[in-house]
């Protein structure tokens, strides 16, 4: 909404600053953080009162969790999504379609996660919505978003897969790109969901990825920078940097309450939504493969589960002591802070590697 203050810049020159994406991104960071900082305690208290016993803990998971995490409320993603939405609505260009498409995916996935969390809390079981039902809904949301992105672009680029490290190598998938893009978004959502198993483990890598894709969106949406870096220019996507800024701010606010020992868990409400958001931004700015690098930690967590399940079904043996892989290291004797901080370091290194692909062409 504040973007419209540009109309007053002729009489009040100071309002001209709202033209700049960088300024509005900074404003979104501050707004998202302040909203969660100020409203967080009220949200946590209300969730604790309504949930009673809090999030049910898996009996087949690490036994220490039955003691250290018992009674902690979930659905903390509501805090993040609220701060993200407020920051976006206040600071983003309200007529930019990319903003609304990505926000729709984020909130849509958030609703699926919220209902899943609600089922778990009310039934006091770690099994919420059936996996098949959840995937069908996620693919419907992601497919609709990808269709909108292809239709919005109305060019061969919008339906193409861009290969990093090469200047002009693209694979035009046509309308099959809708299916590919949907897999990227759904995969990202569920990969982040699997990562969210320890206090602070998911939110910091999400913020690192959001900051990285905020920069990528800004560069890809700027014709001059895109030409200099020889990346594909996607008009209008620069505005997604504001959305990434809002997520970064809301994530910082949430981390204040999610730092060990956590006062609240983000739950599927947050993890599905944030993963879906990262996936949809990657699709919008044509950096789907780079997402697998920057979000490599999430890929590792997801692959560990796939390998574990496949190995057990085919051979009856487990590759890891427990999956996702962060539980494997718990079983090996690593402390929770050791796992979390080391995974954060990995996330930073992967983000730098992903950003390096912008120049290595």
UniProtKB/Swiss-Prot annotation:
The keyword Transferase belongs to this UniProt entry's keyword annotation: yes
Topology in the lipid bilayer: Multi-pass membrane protein
A GO term, aspect molecular function: UDP-N-acetylmuramoyl-L-alanyl-D-glutamyl-meso-2,6-diaminopimelyl-D-alanyl-D-alanine:undecaprenyl-phosphate transferase activity
The UniProt record lists the keyword ATP-binding: no
Transmembrane stretches, start-end: 25-45, 72-92, 95-115, 133-153, 169-189, 200-220, 240-260, 264-284, 289-309, 338-358
Positions of disulphide bridges: none
Cellular compartments annotated: Cell inner membrane
Pathway: Cell wall biogenesis; peptidoglycan biosynthesis
Reaction it catalyzes: UDP-N-acetyl-alpha-D-muramoyl-L-alanyl-gamma-D-glutamyl-meso-2,6-diaminopimeloyl-D-alanyl-D-alanine + di-trans,octa-cis-undecaprenyl phosphate = di-trans,octa-cis-undecaprenyl diphospho-N-acetyl-alpha-D-muramoyl-L-alanyl-D-glutamyl-meso-2,6-diaminopimeloyl-D-alanyl-D-alanine + UMP
InterPro entries: Glycosyl_transferase_4, PNAcMuramoyl-5peptid_Trfase, PNAcMuramoyl-5peptid_Trfase_CS
One Pfam family per UniProt: MraY_sig1
Domain of life: Bacteria
UniProt entry keywords in alphabetical sequence: Cell cycle, Cell division, Cell inner membrane, Cell membrane, Cell shape, Cell wall biogenesis/degradation, Magnesium, Membrane, Metal-binding, Peptidoglycan synthesis, Transferase, Transmembrane, Transmembrane helix
GO biological process: cell division; cell wall organization; peptidoglycan biosynthetic process; regulation of cell shape
Required co-factors: Mg(2+)
Major localization listed first in the record, in broad terms: membrane
EC number: 2.7.8.13
Catalytic EC class: transferase
GO CC annotation terms, alphabetical: plasma membrane
UniProt function note: Catalyzes the initial step of the lipid cycle reactions in the biosynthesis of the cell wall peptidoglycan: transfers peptidoglycan precursor phospho-MurNAc-pentapeptide from UDP-MurNAc-pentapeptide onto the lipid carrier undecaprenyl phosphate, yielding undecaprenyl-pyrophosphoryl-MurNAc-pentapeptide, known as lipid I.
Database matches in NCBIfam families: mraY
Family to which the UniProt record says this protein belongs: Belongs to the glycosyltransferase 4 family. MraY subfamily.
Protein name in the entry: Phospho-N-acetylmuramoyl-pentapeptide-transferase
């Amino acid at each position: 909404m504040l973007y419209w203050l540009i109309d007053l810049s002729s009489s009040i020159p100071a309002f001209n600053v709202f033209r700049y994406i960088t300024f509005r991104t900074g404003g979104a960071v501050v707004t998202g953080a302040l909203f969660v900082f100020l409203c967080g305690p009220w949200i946590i208290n209300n969730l604790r009162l309504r949930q009673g016993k809090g999030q049910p803990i898996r009996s087949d998971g690490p036994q220490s969790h039955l003691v250290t995490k018992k009674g902690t409320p979930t659905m903390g993603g509501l805090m993040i999504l609220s701060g993200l939405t407020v920051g976006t609505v206040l600071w983003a260009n309200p007529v930019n379609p990319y903003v609304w498409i990505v926000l729709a995916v984020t909130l849509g996935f958030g609703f699926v996660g919220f209902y899943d969390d609600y089922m778990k809390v009310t039934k006091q079981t770690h099994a919420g919505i059936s996996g098949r039902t959840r995937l069908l809904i996620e693919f419907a949301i992601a497919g609709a978003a990808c269709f909108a992105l292809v239709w919005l672009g109305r060019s061969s680029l919008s339906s193409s897969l861009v290969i990093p490290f090469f200047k002009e190598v693209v694979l035009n998938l046509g309308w099959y790109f809708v299916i590919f893009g949907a897999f990227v978004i759904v995969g990202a959502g569920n990969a982040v969901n699997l990562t969210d198993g320890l206090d602070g483990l998911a939110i910091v890598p999400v913020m690192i990825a959001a900051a990285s894709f905020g920069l990528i969106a800004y560069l890809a949406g700027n014709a001059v920078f895109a030409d200099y870096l020889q990346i594909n220019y996607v008009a209008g996507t620069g505005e997604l940097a504001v959305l990434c800024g809002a997520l970064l701010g809301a994530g910082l606010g949430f981390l204040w309450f999610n730092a060990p020992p956590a006062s609240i868990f983000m739950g599927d409400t947050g993890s599905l939504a944030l993963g879906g958001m990262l996936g949809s931004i990657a699709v919008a700015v044509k950096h789907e493969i780079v997402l697998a690098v920057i979000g490599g930690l999430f890929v590792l967590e997801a692959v560990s589960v796939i390998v574990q399940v496949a190995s057990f079904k085919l051979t009856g043996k487990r590759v890891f002591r427990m999956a996702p892989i962060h539980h494997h290291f718990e079983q090996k004797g690593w402390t929770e802070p050791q796992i979390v901080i080391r995974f954060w370091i990995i996330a930073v290194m992967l983000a730098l590697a992903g950003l390096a692909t912008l120049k290595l062409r």
